[in-house]
Amino acid sequence: MNSLSDKIKFVYYRIIFAIRELPVRIKRLLIHLIWIVPYDFKYKQHEIIKTGAEWLFGIPFYIIDVIFLPEIYEITMEMFKWNTRFLTHRELELARSVFGNSILPELVRIDNRSVSGPKQGRFAYVSFQTINCYGHMSDRILIHELVHVWQFLQFGSIYIPKAILAQRSKEGYNYFRTAGLMNMKLRNGRLYHFNFEQQGDIVMDYFNMKQVNDDQAIIESEVYEYFMEDIKSMRIFS
């Protein structure tokens, strides 16, 4: 159970965060709205239609951010869910060791008694900056879910459909480990070229490797470091 003071602190943090984040959210929406499909005869018609549909589908999610729906949702749920908690000191240190200053771990909440979904399906999910699960959550799963928090901070609520589409894609969570990373690096690809669930597993596997003290893990982690630069260099507020 959380104290009332924790609830009040949570609401205060969310309001301050939303106000500070608003200019960035407006900028995201405007950039998205002025995007125009570049008509070029080298593009096939079905590709233009698909890209245009994705553009239209994304508009509501950018609007959701501007009208503070993520914060309204989290504050409302916080009033009804007394199992949510802030990260422990140990969890805060783990988060900072992986993400640096690219997330705000002191704002993250965990509900490890989330009945709707996690209890039946034994899975975790992220609603903006709240991690929902049922029972104990391992460190590796915590890191994976924190990637979705990071995605929300960097890209907005659009992370939700992108993560769902990633789960249903042919690749799913599979990024083909070191070989897949090397191939992407050779093509000058970055972390955002992977789908939103692959990103979570890449960071999670990097975290796992850092816990193992053997030569093979050290060698393999070098290519992961290249993509981890994207995690630690991206903004919280601009």
Describe the predicted segments one by one.
Residues 1-61, 66-67:
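N-terminal low-structure segments adjacent to metalloprotease catalytic domains
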Residues 69, 104, 139:
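Active-site surface patch of divalent metal-dependent phosphodiester/phosphate bond hydrolases
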Residues 83-86, 101, 118-145, 153-156, ...:
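Short pre-active-site segment immediately N-terminal to the catalytic Zn-binding motif
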